[in-house]
Amino acid sequence: MSLASRITAESAELLGLQPGQALLALCKATAVRAMPYAESPAAGVNWWEGRVTRLSRGPEVDEVAAQLDAGVQMVGFAPTGSGLRVRSRVKLQVDESAVVLALWD
């Protein structure tokens, strides 16, 4: 599983980032867009494939929990009426600017 994060040069320097270094990547669930598997993710965003494990329907958006093919659990949101169902294939996308990095020891 790979992802991209957009950070400033100053942040990279302060963190002391090095190639191959272990990092923790975080984002809020509100930054995760869930979409039907057949849709194409926008260019310039991180995206992963998985399967819906839980779906909480709402009046404007549905909360979608998914098990990614890489084994990671993620939660995001889809517009109401997206057609997603529990056990359906899904794509999740996160903009590079929404990913926060932390050092992992």
Residue positions per predicted region:
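OB-fold (S1/OB) nucleic-acid-binding surfaces
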Residues: 1-4, 63-74
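Glycine/charge-rich catalytic "coupling/switch" loops of P-loop NTPases
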Residues: 2-60, 80-105
